[in-house]
Amino acid sequence: MNKPQTIYEKLGGENAMKAAVPLFYKKVLADERVKHFFKNTDMDHQTKQQTDFLTMLLGGPNHYKGKNMTEAHKGMNLQNLHFDAIIENLAATLKELGVTDAVINEAAKVIEHTRKDMLGK
């Protein structure tokens, strides 16, 4: 019996993640709601961390070596509107890369589970 595909596999695996995350950050850095959070951020490092985190979160290999989400976002005063902006930018990125709405919705549901940790609530 075949094992069901992970969301990571449905997205296209490593190559898809390496294409998606830089495009995602291009959108994020143009988004007035959230771009200020990245003002003094090493975006090469951030892109690698996010690629590793999303890969792990969506069912791919776990190479993520960063902080847990609560610790990583502590003191940033993130609100629901900021988290929503991130989800919207990721969904737009995946749509632009030809991912189906069904797979985008699957990914969004998994990512939604990190909201409380990222917002520190």
From Swiss-Prot:
One Pfam family cited in the UniProt record for this chain: Bac_globin
Gene3D superfamilies cross-referenced by the UniProt entry: Globins (1.10.490.10)
GO molecular function: heme binding; metal ion binding; oxygen binding; oxygen carrier activity
Binding-site list for heme: 73
Keyword annotations of the record: Acetylation, Heme, Iron, Metal-binding, Oxygen transport, Transport
Keyword match Flavoprotein: no
Modified residues (N-acetylmethionine): 1
Cofactor(s) demanded: heme
Coiled-coil segments: none
The keyword Signal belongs to this UniProt entry's keyword annotation: no
Co-factor binding details: Binds 1 heme group per subunit.
Protein family according to the UniProt entry: Belongs to the truncated hemoglobin family. Group I subfamily.
Subunit structure: Monomer.
The protein's name in its UniProt record: Group 1 truncated hemoglobin
